[in-house]
């Protein structure tokens, strides 16, 4: 009976620690529009999100990441609101003869606050490596942008049981190079690449398992600061599954793809956080 009592007390203590850590982290819903919408459509989408934002608790931080061509219009549409704007990528260099590139300084000058770096599509289609991403991270920080750094394994890596190793490498080769001050400004997003467009589904338990592992890796390098780092789920997050995902201890929000293109769905996802 004594052992049972001790276990119950410990369970209560762990639950209190979980609630404290979970509640002190930012709740973030970030929309990655990818290569979708035309500029006027993007502005209309931003205006719709803004018009209905008050339906969701002010404790939820909304970020929209439209294509480069939309940034000026979207930033203007969201001016004086609490909805932040981010870019989907930035150059690894600060300026010069890099045709087609957009620098972090340019993004910051427009009014961007965030930038997505290391997205699985950038890694897969454009061959982005840790070496490139280290340079992009440096550019982001040098210009006052907060990176949303993406990690995740593909189907082959998941089925081979290498998912922990892949994510660990992606963290160690880039995030471990940050100073404590830079780390404090970083958001992590986990993308289960194997569950995106494959017909396979990542469960909330699978999401929590890898999110907890990511936080453990971060804690090994940065200590207690890792408990304050938001870790977003970048799988197929929708209004229907957001509550189950966001209830998990180490899931602090979502990096949203398709559902971010409809204002109602995007905002509904923000309602998925547990109530205190």
Identify what each model region corresponds to:
Residues 1-5:
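Short, small-residue-biased leader/transition segments that mark boundaries at the very start
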Residues 9-11:
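Acidic, Ala/Val/Gly-enriched low-complexity intrinsically disordered segments
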Residues 13-276:
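Active-site loop-to-helix "anion-binding N-cap" substructures in soluble metabolic enzymes
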């Amino acid at each position: 009976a004594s052992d049972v009592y001790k276990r119950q007390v410990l369970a209560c203590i762990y639950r209190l620690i979980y609630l404290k850590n979970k509640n002190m982290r930012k709740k973030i819903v970030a929309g990655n529009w990818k290569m979708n919408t035309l500029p006027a459509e993007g502005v209309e989408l931003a205006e719709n999100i803004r018009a209905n934002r008050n339906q969701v608790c002010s404790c939820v931080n909304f970020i929209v990441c439209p294509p480069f061509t939309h940034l000026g219009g979207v930033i203007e549409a969201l001016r004086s609101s609490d909805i932040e704007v981010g870019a989907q990528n930035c150059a690894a260099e600060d300026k010069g003869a890099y045709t087609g590139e957009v620098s972090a300084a340019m993004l910051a000058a427009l009014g961007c606050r965030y930038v997505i770096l290391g997205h699985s599509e950038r890694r897969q289609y454009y061959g982005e490596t840790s070496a490139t991403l280290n340079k992009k991270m440096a550019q982001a920080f040098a210009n006052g942008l907060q990176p949303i750094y993406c990690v995740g394994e593909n189907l082959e890596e998941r089925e081979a049981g290498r998912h922990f190793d892949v994510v660990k490498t992606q963290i160690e080769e880039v995030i471990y190079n940050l100073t404590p001050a830079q780390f404090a400004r970083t958001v992590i997003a986990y993308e289960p690449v194997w569950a995106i467009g494959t017909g396979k589904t990542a469960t909330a338990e699978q999401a929590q398992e890898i999110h907890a592992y990511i936080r453990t890796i971060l804690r090994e390098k940065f200590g207690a600061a890792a408990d304050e780092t938001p870790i977003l789920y970048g799988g197929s997050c929708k209004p229907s599954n957001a509550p189950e995902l966001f209830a998990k201890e180490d899931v602090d929000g979502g990096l949203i793809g398709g559902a971010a293109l409809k204002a109602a769905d995007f905002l509904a996802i923000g309602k998925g956080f547990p109530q205190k």
